[in-house]
């Protein structure tokens, strides 16, 4: 069994942490995130954060690792940020970003327009001869992953030609076409 919960979290400079009864607030140069927790205790001393479980019950062991990972993701997010990159594979597939709106041309009769949350920054890269790339950046790992999954769901990669929206580096399982 993994013992991720036992690993201490080192807090980098420029990140401040406030711990109240069952809530932790992490502030950094990129933003501020808060998270409620239960069945664990969080202690801070000398730039190191420790998450300890209240008992050895199975559900407390599970939450121990969960909350340690969530808090670690928050600390990394407010200090460095999280990035997801999506690649548009297909003829005529384009993406343009205007502020907090992302417009996608995905082969439908209409273009797909998606408005993004304030916390997510979007950037599109289109080079001649290469597939367009959408870069999503935020301090909230869960939010950037959720937005990326929503964009990918507009046109999932299909297994025959591989067309669609995929994460950069994602391997698509390809199928052989029918034998004529």
Model segments located where?
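N-terminal intrinsically disordered, cationic/polar leader segments
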Residues: 2-76, 80-149, 153-180
């Amino acid at each position: 069994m993994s013992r991720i919960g036992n690993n201490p979290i080192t807090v980098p400079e420029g990140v401040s942490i406030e711990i109240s009864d069952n809530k932790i607030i992490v502030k950094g140069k990129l933003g501020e995130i808060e998270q409620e927790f239960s069945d664990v205790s969080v202690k801070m001393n000398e730039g190191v954060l420790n998450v300890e479980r209240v008992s050895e019950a199975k559900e407390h062991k599970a939450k121990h690792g969960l909350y340690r990972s969530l808090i670690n993701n928050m600390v990394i997010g407010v200090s460095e940020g999280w990035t997801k990159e999506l690649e548009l594979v297909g003829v005529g597939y384009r993406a343009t970003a205007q502020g907090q709106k992302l417009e996608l041309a995905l082969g439908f009769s209409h273009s797909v327009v998606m408005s993004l949350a304030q916390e997510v920054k979007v950037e599109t890269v289109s080079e001649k001869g290469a597939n367009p790339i959408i870069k999503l950046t935020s301090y909230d790992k869960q939010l950037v992953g959720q937005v990326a999954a929503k964009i990918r769901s507009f046109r999932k990669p299909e297994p025959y030609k591989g067309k669609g929206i995929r994460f950069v580096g994602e391997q698509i399982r390809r199928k052989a076409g029918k034998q004529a």
